[in-house]
């Protein structure tokens, strides 16, 4: 409904040495991979699907002013992989390819429609945008995710429910609005379906991780910036969104290995468990099945069986003896 039910702007408000007075929820920070769901949702709106195949192989992109060659967090490659698993495994190379397919300008349009106010001069952004190359505010970041949680409808943020005078007379009182359909419903249901699919992230994070709430469906994504300056976790149920940022107010790097899944996700998990412990379990509605006859979008047609000549190792021809032909 847009209500901000809890907000912590710093670890210790009275800690002057570490800028405790600074409210980091409204301070621009790079979001790392927690921005990937924005790009993938823009892709779903364009007609791409979670089942489509992306090639996770080292690739040089020459569309940026400088040749850009993104690397995965583990520096490895996974070959052909579904968009679903690429997002859930937080693979960087497929994410950049998805942004390339959708277009930087289209993604920025979509992000701004979700309420992000920090992008400004668009000429600053290239394909690294999908890896968190643009700064965001934690409050706006969580508000954007709320549209996914609410089947594409986003409602205005509010942190004040009622204003009374000294005698108790109500001067202003919050009334829930209908909100606005920012994201097409099925695209919102699709991104929630992907982000709540723990099995699809297990090949990187394992089945037992801090993005899981036992017995309760939850959609979540972590993020980490270069040199561990920022660690994020954003996640939601159909009725509650929570965002966590961990870092230093002076932008000093944290210790090596301080990524979102290690230091932000446990905080997010603990909050969500406590906040939801006496509430009913909610299910995410299933998205409508993909309607397309294009094998590429269905994750098919990426492999082809060919016949080779066992002697030469080359493609067999009509002149190759049958006993030397191998599939």
PLM features: what roles do these ranges have?
Residues 1-29, 33-34, 46-52, 105-113, ...:
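Periplasmic/cell-envelope proteins involved in peptidoglycan metabolism and beta-lactam response
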Residues 54, 122-123, 159, 230:
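Short loop/turn and capping residues at structural boundaries
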Residues 120-123, 210:
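Short helix/loop segment immediately N-terminal to the Walker
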């Amino acid at each position: 409904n847009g209500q901000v039910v809890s907000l912590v702007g710093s670890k210790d408000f009275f800690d002057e040495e570490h800028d405790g007075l600074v409210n980091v929820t409204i301070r621009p920070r790079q979001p790392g991979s927690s921005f990937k769901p924005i790009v993938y949702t823009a892709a779903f709106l364009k007609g791409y699907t979670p089942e489509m195949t992306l090639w996770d192989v080292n690739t040089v992109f020459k569309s940026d002013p400088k040749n850009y060659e993104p690397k995965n967090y583990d520096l490895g490659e996974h070959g052909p992989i579904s968009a679903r698993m690429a997002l859930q495994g937080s693979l960087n190379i497929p994410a950049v390819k998805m942004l390339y397919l959708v277009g930087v300008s289209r993604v920025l349009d979509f992000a701004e429609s979700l309420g992000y106010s920090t992008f400004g001069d668009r000429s600053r952004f290239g394909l690294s945008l999908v890896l968190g190359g643009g700064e965001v505010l934690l409050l706006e970041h969580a508000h954007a995710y709320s549209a996914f949680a609410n089947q594409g409808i986003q409602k205005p943020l509010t942190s004040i429910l009622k204003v009374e005078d000294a005698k108790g007379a109500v001067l202003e009182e919050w009334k829930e609005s209908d909100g606005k359909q920012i994201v097409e419903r099925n695209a919102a249901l699709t991104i929630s379906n992907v982000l709540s699919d723990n099995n699809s992230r297990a090949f990187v994070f394992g089945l037992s991780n801090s993005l899981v709430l036992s017995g309760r469906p939850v959609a979540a994504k972590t993020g980490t910036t270069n040199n561990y300056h920022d660690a994020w976790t954003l996640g939601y149920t159909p009725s509650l969104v929570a965002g966590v940022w961990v870092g230093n107010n002076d932008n000093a790097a944290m210790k090596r290995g301080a990524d979102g899944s290690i230091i932000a996700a446990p905080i997010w998990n603990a909050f969500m468990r406590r906040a939801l412990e006496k509430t009913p379990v909610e299910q995410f509605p299933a998205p409508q099945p993909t309607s397309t006859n294009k094998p590429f979008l269905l994750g098919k047609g990426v492999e082809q069986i060919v016949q080779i000549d066992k002697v030469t190792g080359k493609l067999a021809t009509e002149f190759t003896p049958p006993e030397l032909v191998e599939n």
